[in-house]
């Protein structure tokens, strides 16, 4: 089990925002690191969703509730307002129908928390300036094997939220 200090930086930020004893849906939960930490340290009731079989196995081995599903078709298995928080961490850039998933997140949850690789971050821009696609902790793939299909900045994401009548809250 990861201590708060060893959580990935974005997961640490997310964990800090989630109140104890909350209901959490973690979309694209990967190995379940966030959910496992939240259940152990904040007594949350959580469900993870991922499409990858190895991720599902890792979550099950940790004793987490997890569903293997493709989020691209929506979250129809969940009722409106089922969760206090819906998390989408480092996953949105690999999805085709971003507007649908954002709508669905806010349908099934009271609060949506989204993190993504910021391609406008100065270190990423510097790598592009010197002729290389960015590779970092949050963008660990080479250009030829990346699942990322959307490359956005915080301003781009804020503009998308504005189209949907939402705004960016950065605590």
Task: Identify the role of each PLM range.
Residues 85-97:
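A short SAM/SAH-binding and catalytic strip from SAM-dependent methyltransferases
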Residues 33, 37-74:
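Class I SAM-dependent methyltransferase SAM/SAH-binding core
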Residues 100-104, 111-171:
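S-adenosyl-L-methionine-dependent methyltransferase catalytic module, highlighting the catalytic core
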Residues 23, 45, 111:
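Residues at the starts of beta-strands that form the adenosine-phosphate
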Residues 22-30:
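Conserved class I S-adenosyl-L-methionine
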Residues 5-21:
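Conserved alpha-helix/loop element of class I SAM-dependent methyltransferases that forms part
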Residues 20, 81-82, 108:
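Alpha-helix C-terminal capping/helix-to-coil transition sites in glycosyltransferase folds
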Residues 74-80:
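Short conserved loop adjoining the S-adenosyl-L-methionine
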């Amino acid at each position: 089990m990861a201590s708060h200090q060893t959580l990935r930086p974005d997961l640490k930020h997310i964990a800090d925002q989630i109140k104890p004893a909350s209901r959490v849906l973690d979309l694209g939960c990967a190995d379940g690191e966030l959910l496992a930490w939240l259940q152990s340290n904040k007594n949350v009731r959580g469900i993870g969703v991922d499409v990858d079989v190895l991720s599902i196995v890792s979550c099950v081995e940790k004793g987490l509730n997890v569903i293997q599903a493709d989020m691209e078709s929506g979250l129809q298995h969940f009722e409106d307002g089922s969760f206090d928080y819906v998390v989408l961490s480092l996953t949105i850039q690999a999805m085709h129908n971003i507007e649908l998933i954002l709508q669905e997140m806010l349908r099934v949850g009271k609060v949506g928390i989204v993190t993504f690789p910021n391609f406008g971050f100065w270190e990423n821009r510097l790598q592009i300036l010197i002729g290389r696609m960015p590779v970092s902790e949050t963008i660990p793939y080479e250009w030829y094997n990346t699942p990322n299909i959307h490359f956005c900045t915080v301003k781009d994401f804020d503009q998308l939220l504005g189209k949907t009548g939402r705004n960016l809250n950065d605590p």
